[in-house]
Amino acid sequence: MNSFWLRLRERLINFYPPLLGAGIRSRTIDDLTIHVEMKLTALNRNIVGVHFGGSLYAMCDPWFMLIMMRALGPDYIVWDKAARIKFVSPGHGTVKAVFQIPQERVNEIRAVADRGEKIEPTFSVDVWGEQGQVIAHVEKLLYVRKK
């Protein structure tokens, strides 16, 4: 899949119902970085008036996989395999996260996959509140191999 179609898919993902309903918006900065934010609304507020944990997780779900798919190209299989979220403090207002994979890490993963091996890299991201406090820490485990 060429770059145009990947970028179009990334723009259209903002209209995917679970993301749209939670008010999650993404913005691609470059090939290896995506900024995501979510405003607190009646649709993503929990019973105590802060961000619902499921929405915080949904905010972090697809991005590392999408970055890795774009970085490696169509000759590789990339799947989300597992995730873990640790809630650190209540989220009020708009929360944000920056998903980034360094080019050196992409090169390391590609080298392992090119040897015919599967690789299961782990990535982490913090979700930040408006005052700069950490709201949640998320770890994602991917599965990567050459087709």
Residue ranges and their predicted role:
Residues 36, 83-87, 97-99, 123-125, ...:
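A structural signal for short, well-ordered beta-strand segments
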Residues 43-63, 77:
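Hot-dog-fold acyl-thioester-processing enzymes
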Residues 29-33, 88-94, 128-133:
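A short, structured loop/turn motif at beta-sheet edges
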Residues 67-104:
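Hydrophobic beta-strand-centered segment that forms part of the acyl-chain substrate-binding groove
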Residues 22, 32-34, 79-83, 93-97, ...:
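A generic structural signal for short beta-strands and their flanking turns/coil linkers
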Residues 102-147:
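HotDog/MaoC-like acyl-thioester-processing domains
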Residues 20-25, 81-87, 108-110:
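Short structured motifs
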